[in-house]
Amino acid sequence: LNHPDRKSEISYFGFDEETGLEIRVRPDIEIRLPYESICADVKSVSLGYVRQERLKDRLHREIIERDYHLSAAMYCDVANLDKFFWIFVNKDAGYHWVAVVEASQELLELGRQEYRRTLRQINEALETNNWPAPITESYTDELNDFDLRRLEALSI
């Protein structure tokens, strides 16, 4: 945060090659070094009391549920950045902590594939003027991998 080459909230603009849609990003923090360029996004969270051994799972869940990996990939692509970090700051009174989390290349690729799909969907909706609802049929809610691991751990 105190690096002498740190820049804050620089705006970048580009156009998606496939759809022609304009893309705009503004990383909270970026540092361009001779050998790599990195950026970080500061996120305040309210996770309550989290046991240390479960914090990584909770932060990963936060990243996925809020689609932070999509914006991370978009930031890296549009601003030509090599690495992405989140700086999570817990805002619960009396329980302050900070966690710095690097986005793996696999997580960035997942975000990239998901934001590319989303851009295609937006482009199709713009072209057809058909904006589909997020849920179009009833479904059965099932446990995800995170909850299955919790169930397995509690069943032992």
Segments from the language model and where they lie:
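Metal-dependent nuclease catalytic regions and adjoining charged, substrate-binding loops involved
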Residues: R61-H69, M74-I156
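Catalytic cores of nuclease domains that cleave nucleic-acid phosphodiester backbones
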Residues: L1-D57
